[in-house]
Amino acid sequence: MTTPQRNQSARAFGRALKAARLERGLRQEDLAERGDFDRTCPSMLEHGRRSPSFFVILQLARALRMKAVVLFAEAVAQLRKEGRP
């Protein structure tokens, strides 16, 4: 995967994460607390400045009280909306 593709994937995941967080009425600070993250982590992920590891995706899903596969699928849907496979 090239750097532009990696960046686009990180941004798509960030949009999916933000949508899931907002659907639950959570602030970034709430998500950080629930997931035991540094307070800057949700912001960095939502803006595509950081790519999540598998473990972080699991923690995020748990904090959002959703299945990790659903969160991941939402990120893939974001990529497809942009015309990326």
Regions found by a protein language model. Name each.
Residues 1-23, 69:
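A short, Lys/Arg-rich alpha-helix, primarily the initiator
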Residues 30, 40, 55:
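Active-site phosphate/pyrophosphate-handling residues
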Residues 17, 31-32, 42-45, 71:
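Conserved hydrophobic/aromatic packing and binding residues within compact polymer-binding modules
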Residues 2, 62, 70-85:
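Short, charged recognition helix plus adjacent turn
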Residues 49-61:
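Short, basic-rich loop-to-helix N-cap that marks the start of a DNA-contacting helix
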